[in-house]
Amino acid sequence: HLAAKKLVEMGCERLLFLRIGSTVAGESDKRRDGFESFCRGAGVEHDTLYLCDSDGYAPFRAFLQAHIHQGRLDYDGIFCCTDALTLEIQKMLSELGIRAPEDVQLIGFDGTAIHMGRAPECSTIVQPIPLLAETCVDILLKEDKSDLPSLICLPVSYAPGGTTQDPI
């Protein structure tokens, strides 16, 4: 939700969600659900591309190439399910003559560089790693697990990292 909202706030009109991962349902599915829910609610044109780990990155390159017309990408905002994928997509786009953030804005997800004391390598949705760790320990140490909620949502935040056109 937050990534799509940020991209729209920065002027993007046609968004793309990219994911590579397991075929087993997981957290990145929730990222896609939030992305799609925001886009539908805001009337924003969007597409998604879901790949399995075994597919590798080649299908992303083919998809991106097929969506470049007269030197322009059909999308002006892309949300990738991880920061690592964001950096791979940025590299592919650069090789195809598409620049971030000038031609397309990219946002990743995890923000682990920030928690390691480094500046983010891409604009990202930051997970609250210390709070996540504390919550996990609390759950593990809880004697009576019968009243645990089926879902615990922790607050995420946005951090600019050079792949979006953030106001100064």
Language-model-detected regions and their locations in the chain:
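Short acidic/polar active-site loop segments enriched in Thr and Asp
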Residues: M10-L15, L73-D76
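Secondary-structure boundary/capping motif
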Residues: C12-R14, S37, Y57-R61, A100, ...
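Short acidic capping loops at alpha-helix termini that bridge into adjacent secondary structure
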Residues: R14, H46-T48, R99-Q105
